[in-house]
Amino acid sequence: MPRIKIDLPERFIFSTELAIYVNHINYGNHLDNSALISLVSEARVRFLKSLGYTEMNVEGYGIIVADVAAQYRSEAFHGEVMVIEMAADDFNKYGCDL
C-alpha cells in the first residue's frame, strides 16, 4: 500500500504545544495512533477558541470531522512536547480542511 502524502501549506496560522503523557504511550513505548488523534482534537479546540469559536458554534454551525489522515514524520515519546500547527484551506459549502 503506498504511503499517503499530505501537502502542507507554506504558512500556518496557529500553533500550540501539547505534552505527551504516559497515557498517550503504547506497548511500543511511543505515542499511540489513537492518542495522536486525541491530541490533534485538543489542538483543534484550541485553534477554534483562539478565533472565538467552539466546536459546537462556528458561525452558527457545529463541527463534524468527516476524515482524518496522518503522515508520520517521527516518533513521539513520554515527556516530550509536541508542537501542532494548523491552517484552514479548501473552503467549500460543506466546510474546510484543517
Model-derived regions: residue spans:
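Hot-dog-fold acyl-thioester-processing enzymes
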Residues: 2-67
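Hydrophobic beta-strand-centered segment that forms part of the acyl-chain substrate-binding groove
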Residues: 47-97
